[in-house]
Amino acid sequence: LKYDYCNAPEDVTTAFPRYKKMGDALKKTGRPMVYAICEWGQRKPWLWARAAGGHLWRTTWDSRGVWQSNNKDLTGIMEIFDQQKDLAQYAGPGGWNDPDLLMVGLYGKGKSSSVGGRFKGCNTIEYRSHFILWAMLSAPLIVNLDVRSMDKETADILLNKEIIAINQDSLGKQAVTLFIRDNIQVLKKELRNGDLAICVFNRGDQPASFSLDLKKDLN
């Protein structure tokens, strides 16, 4: 159940009991249900959504189908990704930060995500990066397109078993940024059995060479 909080009072003291009432009602059904809290991160739900019975909570405004919007009122993929940087401690088994749906494969389709055709989508490299970043964040990987008509490039991204395995690792840790150096961002996600997933992400719009010292840079 996704529970939107449209046109509601801005204070958390009103929001929490409303969401908890629904959370309690869902538990009483005796059926396993996923409870998604959506108030767009305005009341810092990562601090209280678990106690309200939530399993995931939106951390930002709605995502748009553009890599970077450069518009404070229209959040692109990169704007949303950057807003997750201080939230890792709140994610874990049973409760997840939700940076919104995947835009992978939309290519400007969707009236809302494209803002009525204003945004034409991303290229394949950007979509691949988007999917990997959301996997590293331990975010819910919720597809936002008609899978019956997706092209091969989109299917190859969304069905990548190794990336999905990183996202679904049972430890449930959200990746943290180790450093950003000359437009290269390095993220570390702890996995069960002491393993690590490392993401070397080029934030720039040009190819770049980068060397990672596993002994020095990962500490």
Segments from the language model and where they lie:
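Loop/turn elements at helix/coil->beta-strand transitions in domains of secreted/extracellular proteins
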Residues: 1, 28-34, 52-54, 193-196
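The substrate-binding groove and active-site-proximal loops of carbohydrate-active enzymes
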Residues: 1-13
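A cross-family glycoside hydrolase active-site/sugar-binding cleft signature
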Residues: 4, 36-38, 199
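Soluble non-cytosolic domains of exported or imported proteins
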Residues: 12-17, 126-127
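Alpha-helical scaffolding segments of alpha/beta enzyme cores, especially the outer helices
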Residues: 17-24, 28
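Glycan-recognition surfaces
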Residues: 34-145
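Catalytic cores of secreted or luminal carbohydrate-active enzymes
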Residues: 129-179
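Carbohydrate-binding surface patches
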Residues: 134-137, 142-144, 180-219
